[in-house]
Amino acid sequence: MFEGFKTFVMRGNVIDLAVGVVIGTAFSAVVNSLVNDILMAIVATLIGQPDFSDVLVFGAVRLGAFITTIVNFLIISAALYFLVVVPINKLSEFTRRNEPPPAPPAPSAEEKLLTEIRDLLRQNIT
């Protein structure tokens, strides 16, 4: 029973996922600090408020807090896209560009048979 669990945990996908979660948590703290401490300070100087939490309050409905969450999400998404996704895509494209093109696949048995039939038909016509 424990041997099967050990095999499951030691598979590459589980280890990669665990590392990704840990790195994602650490990166999330960095991005949250960037948003809350730097970018929202810039928003505060432009708009006059550090966030929108108290802007639109209708009783228990805090629409401003929802708007602040959306702004944070958009900033975090843009930061992740431009700081992680774009460089990884460019690196992947660069490595693909430097790889030799794959060799064409060998003809299948069906293709060989069709080629023989074609050649025989050409011989009968001439």
Curated annotation (Swiss-Prot):
It is a multi-pass membrane protein. SUPFAM superfamilies: Gated mechanosensitive channel. GO terms for molecular function: mechanosensitive monoatomic ion channel activity. GO terms for cellular component: plasma membrane. Keywords: Cell membrane, Ion channel, Ion transport, Membrane, Transmembrane, Transmembrane helix, Transport. It comes from the Bacteria. It is found in: Cell membrane. InterPro entries: Mechanosensitive_channel_CS, MS_channel, MSC/AndL, MscL_channel. The keyword Translocase does not apply. The chain crosses the membrane at residues 14-34, 66-86. Channel that opens in response to stretch forces in the membrane lipid bilayer. May participate in the regulation of osmotic pressure changes within the cell. Homopentamer. Belongs to the MscL family. This is Large-conductance mechanosensitive channel. It comes from Roseiflexus sp. (strain RS-1). The gene is mscL.
